[in-house]
Design a protein with these regions (language model features):
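Carbohydrate-active catalytic/glycan-binding domains of CAZyme proteins
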Residues: 1-273
Length: 273
């Protein structure tokens, strides 16, 4: 079991007023980090345009001076899908993996609904130029609706190459309490190549009590044979918090939220719903 963690908040790094781009009029959300070289890291994230639609761009930073942005693209590296597709109203970065000289960007596609607030499905885009531009692997989501997973929230994946296997922990909707309140937990999918995925509907992290309504945005490391997951969770009484869990097999997890070492602030850091 890991010891208690302690995090120091350094404040805002990427904001719309620091980056003057038409794809980033408002918002800088859902950071997804890739190590470039040395102390340089690329933070993929989404801004929102004048139509309040999320588009994916990036900012390169030096980890020793993260307030200074080295580079951002003039245009988004991934825009909206074609009209009527699962990602025609927004795209959000979720995980980036380097594989055979390619960058695989697993992303969230946003789709407005009529009877429920939205659909969120998982897409894949590929870069052959070290992450400067991306092309969709498919116009369809790479996770599929099934009888065990019939709701259109299969999303926010984290992908880990684990020896010869690929593992994906992702958000899966268990149902809607009403049109604006989905309930979702974390499930596991597996793959031999990172492109085609097998969904068994295995619940890895479920709600810890009746009030908890969401477990989301998993991020997983494997150290000394132990899988370590940072996650987000919320319940009916509070907004999102960061949680933590550990597993020996990647399937059965023990929640250890009390040792995560970070909580909400009184300023902007505590406002995310």
């Amino acid at each position: 079991m890991s010891d208690s963690m302690k995090w120091k908040k350094l404040g805002q790094i990427i904001t719309p007023n620091k980056i003057n781009r038409n794809w980033m009029i408002t918002h800088a959300m859902d950071p997804t980090v890739d190590h470039i070289e040395g102390d340089i890291f690329r933070v993929y994230f989404c801004g929102r345009n004048n139509n309040n639609q999320s588009l994916i761009g990036y900012a390169d930073i030096d980890i020793n001076d993260p307030q200074k942005i080295i580079k951002t693209p003039e245009n988004p590296i991934l825009g909206l899908g074609s009209l009527g597709s699962f990602d025609d109203n927004g795209v959000t970065a979720s995980c980036i993996v380097t594989h055979k000289n390619q960058k695989l960007l697993y992303y969230i596609g946003w789709k407005p609904r009529s009877t429920t607030r939205f659909g969120l499905m998982t897409g894949l885009a590929i870069s052959n130029d070290k992450g400067e531009t991306f092309k969709r692997f498919s116009k369809a989501p790479i996770l599929k609706l099934t009888d065990r997973e019939p709701y259109s929230i299969l999303t926010a994946p984290f992908v880990l190459k684990d020896n010869n296997d690929w593992k994906m922990w992702y958000v899966s909707c268990e149902g809607w309490e009403h049109s604006d309140l989905p309930k979702y937990n974390i499930k596991l999918a597996t793959s031999s190549d990172g492109f085609e995925w097998k969904q068994d509907g295995i619940i890895c992290l479920n709600f810890k009590n009746e009030k908890e309504t969401a477990i989301a945005r998993p991020c997983v490391l494997k150290e000394k044979g132990i899988y370590r997951m940072w996650l987000s969770y919320k319940n009916l009484d509070q907004n999102y918090r960061i949680g933590y869990a550990e597993s020996e097999d990647g399937i059965n997890w023990i929640r250890m939220d009390d040792i995560v070492g970070i909580d909400v602030s009184e300023n902007w850091l505590g406002l995310r719903k």
